[in-house]
């Protein structure tokens, strides 16, 4: 391992010993906020230090076995050679595991998200494809045990959505979906096409992490225009009786959010404010993320909404992710919720890039 990594591990080992002492301190135990913070840090550092100790032990075993390779006894040399081989394999696995543990954690990975899907070029066909993408993510959410709720929808004239916004809640939602942001292109023969010509349409997907209440951007109420209107969404006859839908305009940025799916105006307002906070936060962070991605020549992780990231070709049954040159001939399975087949290689590529940066 590189000297820079070893230095980092030595510092972590010292910190681990310090945390162990702190968690046994009566003053810390009596302060719940400090105790929770130190306990969380301990839980993050402990597996790294434990693996590092394993690495040091295997390195010592390897050195001992290598010394025996010079012994006069041929049987002992043969046994030592086998021990050297096994120790080297074990060391490679442990060091790889250790490097992954040292990768910088994205603080947003565990967050819920706001999922925005909008039809782009292609008219009715783009709206229909928006519906296909929304079903794909909905079924993927079901497979992972996530909860998905529609906040706002604008249906297409011939099916699908001109725009659909949903909130997805569950374990590591942003960590899984964060690379889905961008332009998704579809190539297929529309049902109305009599000549059998392939049409190309596009939709944009945006995945925004939902901020915690404590971390939400402070919004000046004077900067907001709040309108209420009658919901056109779910709710049966009730929607005709009250103006429960909410539209919030953030005047300085021009960002508009709408929430119409809840019967309660209060709930719609709370959801809309949370979504607005996510969009304002995204506006602040996306420029920095794009700058980092550009500097390091990254495609995965740039999050550029205008970047064409994926093509779904129906005649060939093909899905191609252009960022990592991944092509899969399993379009039906992916659209049925099997998008993990694309997500996992993207995450692996991103991790490989992080590992390369870690060793720089």
UniProtKB/Swiss-Prot annotation:
Keywords: Cytoplasm, Methylation, Protein biosynthesis. The modification N5-methylglutamine is found at residue 237. PROSITE patterns: RF_PROK_I. InterPro entries: PCRF (IPR005139), Pep_chain_release_fac_I (IPR000352), Pep_chain_release_fac_I_sf (IPR045853), Prokaryotic/Mito_RF (IPR050057), RF-1 (IPR004373). One of its GO terms (molecular function) is translation release factor activity, codon specific. GO terms for cellular component: cytoplasm. Belongs to the prokaryotic/mitochondrial release factor family. Peptide chain release factor 1 directs the termination of translation in response to the peptide chain termination codons UAG and UAA. This is Peptide chain release factor 1. It comes from Pseudomonas fluorescens (strain ATCC BAA-477 / NRRL B-23932 / Pf-5).
């Amino acid at each position: 391992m590189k000297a820079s990594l070893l230095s980092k591990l030595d510092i972590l080992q010292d910190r681990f010993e310090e945390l162990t002492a702190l968690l046994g301190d009566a003053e810390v135990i009596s302060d719940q906020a400090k105790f929770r913070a130190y306990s969380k840090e301990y839980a993050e550092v402990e597996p790294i230090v434990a693996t590092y100790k394993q690495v040091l032990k295997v390195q010592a075993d390897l050195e001992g076995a290598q010394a025996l390779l010079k012994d006069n006894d041929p049987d002992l040399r043969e046994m030592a050679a086998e021990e050297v081989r096994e120790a080297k394999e074990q060391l490679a696995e442990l060091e790889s595991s250790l490097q992954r543990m040292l990768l910088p954690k994205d603080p947003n990975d565990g967050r819920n998200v706001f999922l925005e899907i909008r039809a782009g070029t292609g008219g009715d066909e783009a709206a229909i494809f928006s519906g296909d993408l929304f079903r794909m993510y909905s079924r993927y959410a079901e497979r992972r045990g996530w909860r998905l709720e529609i906040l706002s929808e604008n249906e297409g004239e011939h099916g699908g959505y001109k725009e659909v916004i949903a909130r997805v809640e569950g374990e590591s939602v942003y960590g899984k979906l964060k690379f889905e942001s961008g332009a998704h292109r579809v190539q297929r023969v529309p049902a109305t096409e009599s000549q059998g010509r392939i049409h190309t349409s596009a939709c944009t997907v945006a995945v925004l992490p939902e901020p915690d209440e404590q971390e939400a951007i402070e919004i000046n109420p004077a900067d907001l225009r709040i309108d209420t209107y009658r919901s056109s969404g779910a709710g049966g006859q009730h929607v005709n009786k009250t103006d429960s839908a909410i539209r919030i305009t953030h005047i300085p940025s021009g960002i508009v959010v709408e929430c119409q799916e809840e019967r309660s105006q209060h709930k719609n307002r709370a959801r809309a404010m949370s979504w607005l906070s996510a969009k304002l936060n995204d506006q602040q962070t996306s420029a920095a993320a794009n700058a980092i991605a550009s500097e390091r020549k990254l495609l995965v992780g740039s999050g550029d909404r205008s970047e064409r990231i994926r093509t779904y070709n129906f005649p060939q049954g093909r899905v191609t992710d252009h960022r990592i040159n991944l092509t899969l001939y399993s379009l039906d399975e992916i659209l049925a919720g099997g998008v993990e087949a694309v997500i996992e290689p993207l995450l692996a590529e991103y991790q490989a890039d992080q590992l390369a940066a870690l060793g720089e």
